[in-house]
């Protein structure tokens, strides 16, 4: 399995699927399964029985994971979806860079 180019907290845009074009922030990254959970994307409904914790029960909406290959990172400077490159700085630290404008991504 390849390395994921996105991390928790990154702003991304969905490029394929039913939520294509939606933008959001990554809530959770699951590298073992190569999946990410993006806020407001791939929202599913879960039916739950009444429990002590949730005496009402009912239908809850929550975000489900999507494959990390279906999202692209949004560059903070050029505000466009971009591929991620890596560059080693003079002091030896690795940084992710925008392939479109060359800006370092945090």
From Swiss-Prot:
Keywords: Ribonucleoprotein, Ribosomal protein, RNA-binding, rRNA-binding
CDD domains: KOW_RPL26
Gene Ontology CC annotations of this record: ribonucleoprotein complex; ribosome
GO MF annotation list: rRNA binding; structural constituent of ribosome
Secretion signal, residue range per the UniProt entry: none
GO biological process, one term: translation
SMART domains (UniProt xref): KOW
SUPFAM superfamilies assigned: Translation proteins SH3-like domain
Pfam family, one: ribosomal_L24
NCBIfam families per record: rplX_bact
Function: One of two assembly initiator proteins, it binds directly to the 5'-end of the 23S rRNA, where it nucleates assembly of the 50S subunit. One of the proteins that surrounds the polypeptide exit tunnel on the outside of the subunit.
Subunit structure, interactors included: Part of the 50S ribosomal subunit.
Family, as annotated: Belongs to the universal ribosomal protein uL24 family.
Name of protein: Large ribosomal subunit protein uL24
Annotated organism of origin: Desulforudis audaxviator (strain MP104C)
Biological classification of the source: Bacteria, Bacillati, Bacillota, Clostridia, Thermoanaerobacterales
């Amino acid at each position: 399995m390849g390395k994921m180019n996105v991390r928790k907290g990154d702003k991304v845009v969905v490029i394929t699927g039913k939520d294509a074009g939606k933008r959001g922030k990554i809530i959770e990254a699951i590298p073992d399964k190569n999946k990410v959970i993006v806020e407001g994307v791939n929202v599913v409904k879960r039916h739950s029985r009444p429990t002590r914790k949730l005496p009402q029960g009912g239908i809850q909406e929550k975000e489900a994971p999507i494959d990390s290959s279906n999202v692209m990172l949004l560059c903070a400077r050029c505000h466009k979806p971009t591929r991620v490159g890596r560059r080693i700085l003079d002091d030896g630290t690795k940084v992710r860079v925008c392939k479109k404008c060359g800006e370092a991504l945090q």
